[in-house]
């Protein structure tokens, strides 16, 4: 509802369109191993600070996340999102390719499980194991203390869960499609900014050796008139367009 509210404001209240997302420069970095190039090459991140979170906000955030997994992520293949309580983790972060015998405590579990056990026994692992078929190594996001934040695109670590006490959030988005990943990250950040959060960039050193940071500037897209008229259900003159 937050992103819908943002989009409808110019129509309902005659306010000027504001497609720009204010992104403040941050100090957190994330380094991606070159090994990820053939596993899950797109890995992005951002921080949102000062969010006032209650149970309803958590519910809406999780619902939004799953809708993006379905629509933009194509079942988490093109893009998947991880949301973490920043207070429980220690930057800088790094993303490594690990063997399937690596173990950690996944979300909603009490004991450590290996990667193979998660893929065979954890509900999310069973649902999405096919995305890692044929891969000897899988991606893991670590913090500076070697704690596991996430095993994308499957499951987060148990200790990073967002709760009503959370105020600062780290978001990771990983996948195969840069446009889908950037769009998913922008939409989650937009939702949290409407709730009062302040967005900060994360400096990502990609698997290709390049540097990426979130930029909140709008992107222009050219569309055919027929598409606009088809969506809105009316023909338009040149002046109206």
Segments the model singles out, each with a brief description of its role:
Residues 1-241:
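RNA/tRNA-interacting regions in translation and RNA-turnover enzymes
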